[in-house]
From Swiss-Prot:
Pfam families: Pterin_bind (PF00809). Catalyzes the condensation of para-aminobenzoate (pABA) with 6-hydroxymethyl-7,8-dihydropterin diphosphate (DHPt-PP) to form 7,8-dihydropteroate (H2Pte), the immediate precursor of folate derivatives. Is involved in the bioactivation of the antituberculous drug para-aminosalicylic acid (PAS). PAS is a close structural analog of pABA and acts as an alternative substrate for DHPS, leading to hydroxy-dihydropteroate (H2PtePAS). Metabolomic studies show that PAS, despite its in vitro activity as a competitive inhibitor of DHPS, does not inhibit growth of M.tuberculosis by inhibiting DHPS. PAS exerts its antimycobacterial activity through its effects on M.tuberculosis folate metabolism downstream of DHPS. It catalyses: (7,8-dihydropterin-6-yl)methyl diphosphate + 4-aminobenzoate = 7,8-dihydropteroate + diphosphate; 4-aminosalicylate + (7,8-dihydropterin-6-yl)methyl diphosphate = 2-hydroxy-7,8-dihydropteroate + diphosphate. Mg(2+) binds at N13. Pathway: Cofactor biosynthesis; tetrahydrofolate biosynthesis; 7,8-dihydrofolate from 2-amino-4-hydroxy-6-hydroxymethyl-7,8-dihydropteridine diphosphate and 4-aminobenzoate: step 1/2. NCBIfam families: DHPS. It comes from Mycobacterium tuberculosis (strain ATCC 25618 / H37Rv). (7,8-dihydropterin-6-yl)methyl diphosphate binds at D21, D86, N105, D177, K213, R253, V254, H255. One of its GO terms (cellular component) is cytosol. Keywords: Folate biosynthesis, Magnesium, Metal-binding, Transferase. This is Dihydropteroate synthase. The lineage of its organism: Bacteria, Bacillati, Actinomycetota, Actinomycetes, Mycobacteriales. The gene is folP1. One of its GO terms (molecular function) is metal ion binding.
Length: 280
């Protein structure tokens, strides 16, 4: 059976401290140009964020976050780009939606701001609920101890779904993200990826965000043990995009859009050829 077309979400960080591209797109023209380039490369969604969630990052003032993202969201939306706003704050999400954003990507899974659920129930737009069990902890990036990471992440995500539905959100608008690298070890991340079909089996769309993350840098470390730099992790990211597509993911969130678009096209052609051979 041929997989459904996979959404490729391009990452656009309008921040000064994101782990991969912090400081690259603080200028409005640079940010818009990059967003348009990702769309031209095949991104169906451009995910605009104004606050880094990398380990060690400090939270920014809501006004700063808003001032960073709104001009970019507004300009990209005006040019016909489907824009997602990457934020944990309902006020930022509201402003972005009012300026053309069509989706909310919430790395807290709705746990950081109780106003997010009611807002998105009213707005009726897609909402990505990411798993980050330690989001409210004093040390939110220290890996959590899990008994069975796959079962627990799945249960936590379904609890977030239940909370969203209780707030009035249409369950058909929800997308799940297992939160690779968020208070998880490399072993946790690989276990979750291996068990991706278990998340897909919930019937709720699943977004995979592995792009350039630390566990890939560790996997690709040289003989000296030095971790592969972030800009050298795109091939590995594209392989994960291909495997995620093969196993039924709804979408992938990536920095290098073209590499993942190409990888997914290979999977779709491979599976399509199998179908043609069988039907012929």
């Amino acid at each position: 059976m041929s997989p459904a077309p996979v959404q490729v979400m391009g990452v656009l960080n309008v921040t000064d401290d994101s782990f991969s591209d912090g400081g690259c797109y603080l200028d409005l023209d640079d940010a818009v140009k990059h967003g348009l380039a990702m769309a031209a490369a095949g991104a169906g969604i451009v995910d605009v964020g104004g606050e880094s969630s990398r380990p060690g990052a400090t939270r920014v003032d809501p006004a700063v976050e808003t001032s960073r993202v709104i001009p970019v969201v507004k300009e990209l939306a005006a040019q016909g780009i489907t824009v997602s706003i990457d934020t944990m704050r309902a006020d930022v999400a509201r402003a972005a939606l009012q300026n053309g954003a069509q989706m909310v990507n919430d790395v807290s899974g709705g746990r950081a701001d109780p106003a997010m659920g009611p807002l998105l129930a009213e707005a009726d737009v897609p909402w990505v609920l990411m798993h980050w069990r330690a989001v409210s902890a004093d040390t939110p990036h220290v890996p959590v101890r899990y008994g069975n990471v796959v079962a627990e992440v799945r249960a936590d995500l379904l609890a977030s779904v239940a909370d969203a539905v209780a707030a009035g959100v249409d369950p058909a608008r929800l997308v799940l993200d297992p939160g690779l690298g968020f208070a998880k070890t490399a072993q946790h991340n690989w276990a979750i990826l291996h068990a991706l079909p278990e998340l897909v089996a919930t019937g709720i769309p699943v977004l995979v965000g592995a792009s350039r993350k630390r566990f890939l840098g560790a996997l690709l470390a040289g003989p000296d043990g030095v971790m592969r730099p972030t800009d050298g992790r795109d091939t590995a990211t594209a392989v994960i995009s291909a495997l995620a597509a093969l196993h039924g993911a709804w979408g992938v969130r990536v920095h290098d859009v073209r590499a993942s678009v190409d990888a997914i096209k290979v999977v779709e052609a491979w599976m399509g050829a199998e179908r043609i051979e069988r039907d012929g």
